[in-house]
Design a protein with these regions (language model features):
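Short cytosolic juxtamembrane segments of multi-pass membrane proteins
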Residues: 152-167
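Short juxtamembrane loops and helix-capping segments at transmembrane helix boundaries
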Residues: 107-134
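Perimembrane helix-loop junctions in membrane proteins
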Residues: 59, 116-120, 155
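Alpha-helical membrane-interface segments at transmembrane helix boundaries
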Residues: 22-38, 61-62, 91, 127, ...
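Residues at or immediately flanking beta-strands
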Residues: 12-16, 67, 125
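Mechanotransmission and gating elements of multispan inner-membrane complexes involved in transport
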Residues: 1-36
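Transmembrane alpha-helical interface segments in multi-pass membrane proteins
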Residues: 36-112, 135-143, 147, 151
Length: 167
């Protein structure tokens, strides 16, 4: 029987016998590597997106100095200005998250179709659950708020007299 010889190594063997379990283990290893690479890319994308939001919000604070001064002159508190800019940066994060989900889902569907065309059947199937979508949107909002915290703090600390005197 062949099973009796499965663990024996043959010198100068020109072939390899793999069981379905071996193939599944190799495939799982490949998927784990791909998953790690995708997580790395996602982390870099989040960092770059956060820096982009921070830059956008700093620019927004600079361009809206006079508006901030008027708001504070008519009674807006520091916390009001901080919340305004924090929510705005959170919404920028949500917009970026939505674009990312649309592009990611589109790419996953394309890979699914390409694998179906190349292999004749579907081995990979793209699926976006409502829970994952909601979690991604919430996480995007949080990343946006964190990225916009320093510009929002700067906006909140502006003095009305100084901002209205400028320009």
């Amino acid at each position: 029987r062949l099973a009796d010889y499965k663990d024996e190594e043959i010198e100068d063997a020109s072939f390899v016998i793999e069981t379905p379990e071996d193939m599944l283990e190799n495939f799982q290893t490949i998927l784990d590597v791909v998953k790690a690479v995708l997580i790395g890319i996602a982390a870099i994308s989040l960092f770059v997106g956060g820096v982009g939001i921070m830059n956008t919000m700093y620019t927004s604070v600079l361009e809206r100095n006079k508006e901030i001064g008027i708001m504070k002159a008519i009674g807006a508190r520091n916390v009001d200005v901080f919340l305004l800019f924090s929510i705005e940066s959170g919404l920028l994060g949500v917009a970026g998250g939505l674009i990312g989900i649309l592009l990611g889902t589109g790419l996953a569907k394309a890979v699914e179709e390409i694998s179906r065309a190349a292999l004749g059947q579907t081995f990979l199937q793209a699926y976006l659950s409502p829970g994952l979508f909601a979690g991604a949107m919430a996480f995007s909002f949080i990343v946006g708020v964190i990225a916009g915290a320093l510009p929002a703090l700067k906006a909140a600390k502006l003095q009305p007299a100084d901002t209205l005197r400028e320009e």
